[in-house]
Amino acid sequence: KAVNMLMRKSTGKDGEILNYDLYSDFGQALGENPTLVDEELNALKVAVLPLQDGEFYHYGTSREMISSTMAIQNLVYDQRAIMHLGVKAHPSIFTQNCCHGIKFEATNPNIWIENSWVPSTWTLTHENIITGVPQNDWSISLAPGICVDVAPMGETQWVLRPYGFNDAMRGDLRDVSTEYLGRPVG
């Protein structure tokens, strides 16, 4: 029942996908004292089950993705129990399922490379997130706070989707408080 409601609220009359947030739109309409009035959602029954030793890590923003992963990583203090080669140049550098030729330094905090090919011809600074980059020999220099996502389009083409590390990924494009690549768009 709840999933069907979520699907209806996320889809427009013509089937287009609407911006409907699971936490701020859906979640706040649940419970005995909801902060959002929506009669249909308010009528749902909700149960909260506490988990023994449960913890919550928020992955809603670029910064939270890194800070939450650092918090999980730092649950293990015995370095012998961590499976990696050498010592990380900074605890907030994360590389997974990737090939890279980058020599990281302590001046490279908040780096995330996932499902990507990042050769030594790339220069990273800090607060850079790189995802989906195919094998390449490009010479690229990312300024602080610039992130890159690459998605396949068809069989042989790629779409580059740059964004800012602190971009909220929401907001009216005419509003000066809405940012893209760390700058106001309105």
Language model features with spans:
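Left-handed beta-helix
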Residues: K1-G186
